[in-house]
């Protein structure tokens, strides 16, 4: 079954208890960030440089209708990857497998005063949309959580009338292996690592007759990608320093993309731009791959 919600969440709205919960993506973590918007500098950076890429995509291609399916993958606050597209006037549809999370995301979009179509769908091997329904279908960093990522990629191609954009963590970068070998080994027992292989992703898309028109790297700040707050990373590395602990925690260390979207901290974009020199260096992307946090492909049906 699927549940479509096309308006902002009315007061008192609740998901029916009969709706079965779908896939779990570190439930305690995503539940926390439905109410705690302090994501950390790394995630604010990731979101805002992704927005820059999406802006370039909108300038180059005619994109009015957008599907993000599934909406999970990026850490931090769930369901806000497509907020910038909505702010640019796109008609956005989001798909999730978890009713509780989708309820929270609908409330978050209400805080932003943005409209969006919210779709609850447990079975991602067949999305509830007609062929050629969206100008852009995309997914960020969620494939390795899925029981059948290849089927989802096929569905993104089917429902797109033009573009398909897919990004995944870059397994060639230093932070990936720091996380995998040293600081977060247990996480990798919960995902299907085959789907960080960009060759596998491209092959799956090309089998659906999608033409790959661009590939590259995104999210290249001057720090490694460990997908955890700096204070937690120091703790797991056994580094105990009250000075560093104070520096990377407390009221003075607050980083919230929601604050940026709500107009509370407009200076965050300038801060991110100050760190994004590696994104802008005019070098081939293959030379940046050892440090870039994500790799992506863009395909076209035309």
How does the language model describe each region?
Residues 211-263:
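Conserved catalytic loop of SAM-dependent methyltransferase domains
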Residues 43-65, 80, 84:
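Conserved alpha-helix/loop element of class I SAM-dependent methyltransferases that forms part
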Residues 65-126:
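Class I SAM-dependent methyltransferase SAM/SAH-binding core
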Residues 192-215:
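Short alpha-helix
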Residues 150-165:
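A short glycine-rich, Lys/Arg-flanked "PGG" loop and its adjoining helix->strand segment in the class I
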Residues 1-38:
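N-terminal, positively charged/glycine-rich alpha-helical extensions of SAM-dependent methyltransferases
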Residues 135-147:
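A short SAM/SAH-binding and catalytic strip from SAM-dependent methyltransferases
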Residues 162-195:
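Conserved class I S-adenosyl-L-methionine
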């Amino acid at each position: 079954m699927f549940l479509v919600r096309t308006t902002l969440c009315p007061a008192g709205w609740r998901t029916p208890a009969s709706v079965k919960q779908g896939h779990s993506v570190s439930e305690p973590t995503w539940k926390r960030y439905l109410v705690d918007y302090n994501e950390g500098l790394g995630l604010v950076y990731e979101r805002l440089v992704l927005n820059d890429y999406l802006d370039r995509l909108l300038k180059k291609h005619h994109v009015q209708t957008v599907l993000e399916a599934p909406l999970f993958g990026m850490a931090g606050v769930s369901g806000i990857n497509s907020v910038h597209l909505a702010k640019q006037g796109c008609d956005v549809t989001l798909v999730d497998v978890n009713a509780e999370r989708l309820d929270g995301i609908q409330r978050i979009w209400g805080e932003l005063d943005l409209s969006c179509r919210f779709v609850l769908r447990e079975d991602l091997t067949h999305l509830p949309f007609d062929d050629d329904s969206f100008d852009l279908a995309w997914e960020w960093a969620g494939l390795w959580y899925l029981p059948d990522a290849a089927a989802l990629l096929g569905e993104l191609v089917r429902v797109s009338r033009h573009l398909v954009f897919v990004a995944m963590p870059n397994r060639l970068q230093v932070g990936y292996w720091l996380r995998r070998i040293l600081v977060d080994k247990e996480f990798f027992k919960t995902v299907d690592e085959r789907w960080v292989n960009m060759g596998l992703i491209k092959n799956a898309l090309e089998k659906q007759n999608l033409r790959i028109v661009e590939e590259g790297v995104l999210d290249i700040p001057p720090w490694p990608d460990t997908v955890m707050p700096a204070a937690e990373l120091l703790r797991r590395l056994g580094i105990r320093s009250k000075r560093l602990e104070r520096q990377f925690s407390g009221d003075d260390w607050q980083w919230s993309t929601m604050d940026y979207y709500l107009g509370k901290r407009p200076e965050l974009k300038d801060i991110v731009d100050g760190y994004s020199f590696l994104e802008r260096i005019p070098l081939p992307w293959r030379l940046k791959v050892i440090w870039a946090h994500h790799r992506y492909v863009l395909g076209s049906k035309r």
